[in-house]
Amino acid sequence: MQKGIKVNLALIIVFILSVLVLFINNLTTPRTLSNQELLVNGLFLFQEPKEISDFSFESSNKEIFTKNNLMGKWSVIYFGFSRCPDECPVAMYELSKLAKVLREKDFYMDDKQWILITIDPERDTPETIDKYAKGFDSEFIGLSSSRPMLLNLATQLAVNNSMPPMDNKEDNHEHLDDHVNNIILVNPKGEFVGFFRPPFDISRLSLTYQSVTQSD
């Protein structure tokens, strides 16, 4: 009789622990949002991903970055420039907070990368833009290239960068200030899947980013 009670008690304890584990897992596992929920929270996803043609950019230490570097990873891409007075540092700061929050949550990051592409290649050398990007997070990558290469990729990613090159005035960046401020999302197949729209908020960025990029 006493043995039966112990067995039943053990089964009850196992059941309670199982329920507790499932409850905690539901709390910690990011919820998969519908496309409408994603849109309400600032992430627009295309019905079908868009192909990206090959490109070639350069980071510091003459490291070449091509479409091949997008394969196998979720890539967040932002177009900005190191002398940007307002929008760029705000967006980059929010992305740095997002990366920090994800690490603190032990979110799987091995297949994630964060890229800043300069829209001012005449002044932002690969070393300059990479240093600027890493000023927000040491894992961020800064890239520069020729203006034709920049415009080709920017057009594919729906970023309006059809502006003339910088002139010789050191502090003149007015024609760059109206650039599209979206944050681009590229999937591990190297396809353009959508974009985050401003204003950027860490809670919404974290919610939508985790929903779309969480590993199985």
Feature map (PLM): residue ranges:
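Short active-site neighborhood of thiol/selenol oxidoreductases, capturing the structured segment around
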Residues: 65-91, 95
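Hydrophobic alpha-helical segments, especially N-terminal targeting/anchoring helices
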Residues: 58-59, 186
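Thiol-based oxidoreductase modules, predominantly thioredoxin-like and allied folds used
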Residues: 108-124, 139-148
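Short, internal strand/loop/helix patches
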Residues: 130-180
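Short loop/turn microsegments at loop-to-beta-strand junctions
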Residues: 52-53, 74-75, 180-182
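N-terminal targeting signals for export/organelle localization
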Residues: 1-54, 215-216
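Thiol-/selenol-based redox modules, centered on thioredoxin-like
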Residues: 168-216
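Conserved helix-turn-beta segment immediately C-terminal to the redox Cys motif
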Residues: 73, 91-116
